[in-house]
Amino acid sequence: MAEPDSTTDSARRSAIEAELRRLEESALYSGQMQFEMTKQWRGINLWLGLPASGLAAISGTVALVSATGRVAAGVIALVASGFGAVLTTVNASHRMNQAAASANSYLEIQTAARQTREVDLPYLAIDEARQVLAEITTRRDEQNKTAEPPNRRAYKKARRNIGSGGQTYAVDETTTPTGR
């Protein structure tokens, strides 16, 4: 390997910075899409869970109040169990929690990439900077393996939210990055 010089160090530092920006952007979009998936799964959980619970309560009430309401109570109970069966099969609450955990993991990766780029990179030795980049990349790759792929709707909503400044910090609007 050639001896490092200031030109080579500068080029490598710029390449590491560019890659950190890519990781940050990737984590930004992936995290926002997972937050959108969290919202969708929460909605599905409520849309299936509330009717199942309400109909079960109604069928129990109808069955207890009147002997002539047994058929109606049975039909309502069957509909409630149908909602419950779909809810159990879809497992919306687990998927909601999984999407939220993935979103937060992506936020951690985004923050680590940004802090490394903005705070640490100017002061790290090139080999140390490369090692930190590799560690953040590994974290992102591991998260990509476990995160559920987002659907088209989550992708579009995430892109719209980011485009409208939904992931912008106020401090970034009033200051400029340190020399970059």
Language-model features, listed with the residues they occupy:
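Conserved non-transmembrane functional hotspots
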Residues: 2-51, 65, 86-180
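Short hydrophobic alpha-helical transmembrane segments
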Residues: 47-91
